[in-house]
Amino acid sequence: MKTVKEKKECQRLRKSAKTRRVTQRKPSSGPVCWLCLREPGDPEKLGEFLQKDNISVHYFCLILSSKLPQRGQSNRGFHGFLPEDIKKEAARASRKICFVCKKKGAAINCQKDQCLRNFHLPCGQERGCLSQFFGEYKSFCDKHRPTQNIQHGHVGEESCILCCEDLSQQSVENIQSPCCSQAIYHRKCIQKYAHTSAKHFFKCPQCNNRKEFPQEMLRMGIHIPDRDAAWELEPGAFSDLYQRYQHCDAPICLYEQGRDSFEDEGRWCLILCATCGSHGTHRDCSSLRSNSKKWECEECSPAAATDYIPENSGDIPCCSSTFHPEEHFCRDNTLEENPGLSWTDWPEPSLLEKPESSRGRRSYSWRSKGVRITNSCKKSK
């Protein structure tokens, strides 16, 4: 039987061993997040690092904190989260211990009933916790997180559709497509794809499904930004559209300095196609008048000469929706766990209404040089 001294020594050894297992954090050289005590990090995992009024927070830590209300307008504080509320939430989190790293400052708690686990967002991501970016923005620990019924025979036998590398042996690191059951992805690959394509271009890489696929990805904790795609936000992304076409496409160019040279005025002025703007010609190369400013290329001239519009042109589909700019985050407490209730419906094509057919016989008339022709073939001068 152990003595009291031996029991205390065993407890001390167990405590020291437990301390060594805790993730050691390097001393920070810059600002850290008030709600997870970490540095800026990867925006795809933690969101944008926001700094204002001597307060610095990760965007994801801000919207996922369990007791942080959004009481302000979108242009106040941090997307509607007021500084005084953030300070109160940081004070509350300072009393909560993370079940992963065993340190204080855990602002997120598991939303499962009777679960008392709290965790920092980065710690939870390392352990396999899951946070949902819709509705009430709930978070779950690794024991109570939503799961998928992925067939284990696929893991290790197939590769990720996006990166073409082998799938992870851990099911929490893989996500299965709801519309293409044979397609399985790495979680990090889907998150990177969602961060790049954003809401307006996010769809199934296999079948282009834009309804079930985004809803399932939201349920499985993928953050889909409500903004323009990353390639549209790059500086000078549309600079090519502002470049004027500068080439003569006439069959025989008569200009001595070549097809890529032209003058601002006169016979060697470059005239662009009035329909497409992607073809050009010198005035003399196409025998245009000195004051002519309108010209059409061979590809557009037949279409421009067509004046007849068929009666069933109303069957041509067109897009009836318009583009909406980025919207600010707003936490909705009325939505359930189904992401379809908070996911904006993707625009569907609509059909133009067919014009009502006129009753009776139609009357057509043409006027040319004083001659009037009607459907009864009567002529009068």
Swiss-Prot record:
Annotated Zn(2+) 3 binding sites: 110, 115, 141, 144
Tissue expression per record: Highly expressed in Sertoli cells, but not in germ cells in adult testis. Expression in embryonic testis is 30-times lower. Highly expressed in colon, spleen, white blood cells, pancreas, lung, liver, placenta and brain. Detected at lower levels in thymus, small intestine, ovary and kidney.
Outcome, altering residue 133 to S: Reduces ubiquitination of histone H3
Principal location: nucleus
Region (Required for interaction with ubiquitinated UBE2D2): 150-307
Region annotation Required for interaction and ubiquitination of the nucleosome core particle: where it falls in the sequence: 67-92
Binding-site list for Zn(2+) 1: 33, 36, 58, 61
PANTHER family, A to Z: PHD FINGER PROTEIN, PHD FINGER PROTEIN 7
Subunit and interaction comment: Interacts with MEF2C; the interaction promotes MEF2C binding to its transcription targets. Interacts with GATA4; the interaction promotes GATA4 binding to its transcription targets. Interacts with UBE2D2; the interaction inhibits cleavage of PHF7 and promotes association of the complex with the nucleosome core particle.
Name under which the protein is recorded: E3 ubiquitin-protein ligase PHF7
Organism this protein belongs to: Homo sapiens (Human)
Primary gene name: PHF7
